[in-house]
Amino acid sequence: MAGFFSLDGGGGGGGGGGNNQEDHRSNTNPPPPVSEAWLWYRNPNVNANANTNVNANAPSSSNAALGTLELWQNHNQQEIMFQHQQHQQRLDLYSSAAGLGVGPSNHNQFDISGETSTAGAGRAAAMMMIRSGGSGGGSGGVSCQDCGNQAKKDCSHMRCRTCCKSRGFECSTHVRSTWVPAAKRRERQQQLATVQPQTQLPRGESVPKRHRENLPATSSSLVCTRIPSHSGLEVGNFPAEVSSSAVFRCVRVSSVEDGEEEFAYQTAVSIGGHIFKGILYDLGPGSSGGGGYNVVAAGESSSGGGGAQQLNLITAGSVTVATASSSTPNLGGIGSSSAAAATYIDPAALYPTPINTFMAGTQFFPNPRS
């Protein structure tokens, strides 16, 4: 054990020095005062074969000499105890570093006896101090002894995983490693992204807009009118040709350009449960002889055929309409076509003047019911 041994001829030895029977030669000169007394301090943690006989006349510079014995000056009791505690902490640090294998693999460099040079021992002690201070201070990780890389935190051999496995040390810390290369991590993340659907949107990204439904264009002659999908105007619900009875009403219409009034006929028919309204305009004398009128239906293509159609048109009163074979039926009078030309009746005499007139190209509005 470590202890203090007085050099002034006294017997006192501190710190457990009484248990060690040490023989030393003291100086024959008169002892110095108590305040200037010198003490030997024995280091038990170094080479036991070191020489313990030291000349008492050694100069005071031997304070810093490294060996089995160190020279201490007895200033006061408190300073001695403080220096003793610091030295003991230093020794504990050296011993723990040597036990863990910190520093060079050659343990002979830790022998700080008189045979080893002072510079080499200082470098070894400095290396132990640096490595032990780095591991205990918490400022950084412990370096591996072999390669110098960062060692595993819980590794008792103070080595990294590669060096610990290459040397064959039985270290439980390096049995299983959780480290995964960056390339494998990226590959696994890409696989997970493709397999698992994205459940939530990242922060800052807006909700994606719903795609606009492109409705198929339907063939219809109705302008500015949206036909619902269940209206019944789909292909196949209406026949290509229709023969039905209708009542035509004579009205007066005028053009926007010249303002001259003319006669026209308006009607409404029901085809397939739907109402079709139109106006028949006067286009001049027909080419099939007689004085009949050549009329066309304004919405003839709305019946779905778009081609020639047969319309059975019946007028009010005694005026009858013959069935036509083309899209421009001929309006006749009573009897044959020649008789109809002779007994032509003015439509104004049959129908009163309407309250409102209709212009070409305008929408038809029926008269209000009384």
Swiss-Prot record:
Forms homodimers and heterodimers with LRP1. This is Protein SHI RELATED SEQUENCE 1. Residues 144-171 bind DNA. One of its GO terms (molecular function) is protein heterodimerization activity. Zn(2+) 1 binds at residues 144, 147, 155, 160. One of its GO terms (cellular component) is nucleus. NCBIfam families: LRP1_Cterm (TIGR01624), put_zinc_LRP1 (TIGR01623). Keywords: Activator, Auxin biosynthesis, Auxin signaling pathway, Developmental protein, DNA-binding, Metal-binding, Nucleus, Zinc. Disruption phenotype: Gynoecia with aberrant style morphology. The double mutant sty1-1 and sty2-1 has a reduction in the amount of stylar and stigmatic tissues and decreased proliferation of stylar xylem, as well as shorter siliques and rosette and cauline leaves with a higher degree of serration. Hypersensitive to 1-N-naphthylphtalamic acid (NPA), but restored by exogenous application of auxin. InterPro entries: SHI (IPR007818), SHI_C (IPR006511), Znf_LRP1 (IPR006510). It holds the Pfam family DUF702. Transcription activator that binds DNA on 5'-ACTCTAC-3' and promotes auxin homeostasis-regulating gene expression (e.g. YUC genes), as well as genes affecting stamen development, cell expansion and timing of flowering. Synergistically with other SHI-related proteins, regulates gynoecium, stamen and leaf development in a dose-dependent manner, controlling apical-basal patterning. Promotes style and stigma formation, and influences vascular development during gynoecium development. May also have a role in the formation and/or maintenance of the shoot apical meristem (SAM). A motif (Required for homo- and heterodimerization) lies at residues 271-274. Residues 1-37 are annotated as: Disordered. Belongs to the SHI protein family. Expressed in flowers, seeds and seedlings. It is found in: Nucleus. The keyword Metal-binding applies. GO terms for biological process: anther development; auxin biosynthetic process; auxin-activated signaling pathway; pollen development; positive regulation of DNA-templated transcription. It comes from the Eukaryota. Residues 8-19 have a biased composition (Gly residues).
